[in-house]
A protein has these predicted regions:
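A conserved amphipathic helix/loop scaffold
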Residues: 96, 123
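Short, solvent-exposed coil/turn elements at secondary-structure transition points
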Residues: 14, 119-120, 142
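Intrinsic-disorder/low-complexity peptide segments enriched for small residues
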Residues: 79, 113-114, 129, 139
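Beta-strand-rich binding/interaction modules
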Residues: 102-119
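C-terminal beta-strand-rich structural cap/linker in extracellular carbohydrate-active enzymes
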Residues: 125-142
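Loop/helix patches that line or flank the sugar-binding groove of alpha-linked glycan CAZymes
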Residues: 1-92, 98-104
Length: 142
């Protein structure tokens, strides 16, 4: 188990801010570039993306669907694409492009609202969406 984990990288400071003492395991050498302190101030960081996901789960408008809604796969035949519905009092579509190359998908119905997007834009023409490499979307469908 020791080989799988290193001390939490809280800051870019000594021992990554994990301890003032000597840590049992060596700190990952990337701690000056990747740490909680930097992730907190970067609106596009993985940490802040997870905060957005948690906020969506807690949002009273979407909680019923996100927490208790039925999960239905969508576009299972597509390579490097994960897509599924959450259906409850609303219909949400979660789509993740797991490759560097763009992928185009056709939404099954009109996009009512973009709830989460890890890119600053979304290329939408009618019901056709062009996903950037590694783009993740959560959209509410009409």
């Amino acid at each position: 188990r020791d080989n799988a984990r290193t001390p939490m990288q809280w800051t870019g400071g000594e021992n990554a801010g994990f301890t003032a003492g000597t840590p049992w395991l060596r700190v990952n050498p990337n701690y000056t570039a990747i740490n909680v302190e930097k992730e907190t101030i970067d609106p596009n960081s993985v940490l802040n993306f997870y905060k957005k996901l948690i906020a969506l789960r807690k949002d009273p408008e979407y909680k019923e669907t996100v927490v208790y809604g039925a999960l239905e796969p969508f576009m299972e035949d597509r390579h490097n694409l994960m897509a599924y519905y959450r259906k409850g009092d609303k219909t949400l579509l979660v789509v993740g492009n797991y490759q560097w190359e763009e992928q185009e998908i056709t939404l099954p119905s009109e996009c009512k609202k973009v709830l989460i997007n890890n890119y600053p834009d979304m290329v939408l023409e009618g019901n056709s969406v062009k996903l950037h490499g590694y783009q993740v979307l959560v959209v509410e469908l009409a």
